[in-house]
Amino acid sequence: MLTYYILLGVLAILACLFQIGGKNRKKDLIFLLIVFVILATTSALRYSTGYDYSYTYAPGFEEVLNNPDISLFGHHYEPGYMLLEKMVAFFSSNYQMIFVVTSVLIIGLFCINYAKYSSNVYLSVILFVLLSEYYCSMNFIRQTIAGVIALFAIPFLKKKKFLPYLLIVLVASTFHKSALILIPFFFINLIPLTKIVFVIYCAVTAVLYFNTERIMNFVTQYWYQGYHLDNVHVQATFEWPFAVAMLIEFLIVFLGASKLTKKDKSNYVYVNYAFFAFFFTLMGTRHSILDRLSVYFEFAFPLSIPLLYTCLKESFPSWWSLFDKHPEEKENRKNAAVTAVFLAFVLCGGLAIHQYALTMDHHGVVPYRCILNQPFYQEYLENLENPQDEPAEPAEEAAPIIEEPVDTPPPETSTQLEMPTPQEENKLPEQTDIPEGMPVEVPLP
């Protein structure tokens, strides 16, 4: 856990330093470049950090290595991710490379998105870590790739341009098909979230909340059949504190809707995103698997909350207004105080969410493990570099076996000397016989 707080502290210090002397585009881009290097490197060098690392993505990459002719469409992974794995496997047989490539891809896309669409890249980056989106990227790799790709559809959603919006969502769905839920959202978003609509949403939410089992039973008959009602991810429930936190985040955006829409009427999109982030997190308290749909909407918070902060900050000339005692500056002083309280509330609330998320460790990122510190990995790299040395050990054992008494059957002796199959050689350390869906505990040396 200390690793992540050091990381957060470094990002906070950098954010403060880069804002000295005022913000400008060049400083924003340099800051994002440094953030990209720090976050991508930390994620790329992880080992068994994130539940899906050990029993999903590392074995999945080894499967592609062992069967390079596997079809893009003949696997339970989506074709976009399968294509990515095949491309990585073409250049490297080191399974860690899939985590290097996906880390660079995910963090790179987030930084590009913030560079293009965030009104305050510094606050966006801090919220990206505080709201556990960074830790989500270490666990739900395919869905995070889909989610960050889908973020680029928001500008087209604002402009109500369905075709480019649809194309981006379809690309996202090639990494995780759950992204297709964003297609009907386009039409839902055509209805602004007014107070009356909000009341209707609340009523519908209440009805759906107490009928989730019927809905899940119907859906899993046709889609995601592995998530039937007996599945552990369906039976398990998500903790209420996360739903409460998501409700607070929604209320922040909802109560600031007037300022957001005053700046740009199309910004009501963020209010809808905030509501559905809360909606699916709430449904996750019934069936935890439903919370995963909130990912596509949660990723918008590092855009919407900084935008609201920017709107508030534009209502006064500078932070010095807090200390200006002139009567004519009363309004500026009040606006500055409100903005300061808002920022403090967001950061303190974010820290609380961050601490609780790491304590509960839903993404399996605690403790952080670095691949370079694992002794077996050095042996793994040596075997990749010198594969011709591997058969030497069984050959040396042949001598004492040949000297056995004559009555020892030769066929049995020869079977003892057989080399492991390539599939066995390529298995991950401590990966044999791992039950599907269970995290792997790797003891530290």
Go through each PLM region and give its residues.
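Specific aromatic-rich, kink-prone transmembrane helix
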Residues: 145-161
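Transmembrane helical bundles and short interhelical boundary loops of multi-pass, membrane-embedded
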Residues: 273, 281, 288, 328, ...
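Membrane-interface alpha helices of multi-pass inner-membrane proteins
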Residues: 133, 153, 164-188, 204, ...
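Transmembrane-helix signature of polytopic, membrane-embedded enzymes
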Residues: 26-27, 111-131
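Short hydrophobic/aromatic helix or loop-helix immediately within or flanking a transmembrane segment
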Residues: 54-63, 70-93
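Membrane-embedded helix bundles of polyisoprenyl
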Residues: 122-140, 144-149, 178
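Alpha-helical transmembrane segments and terminal signal-anchor/GPI-anchor hydrophobic tails
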Residues: 49, 54-58, 64-65, 186-298, ...
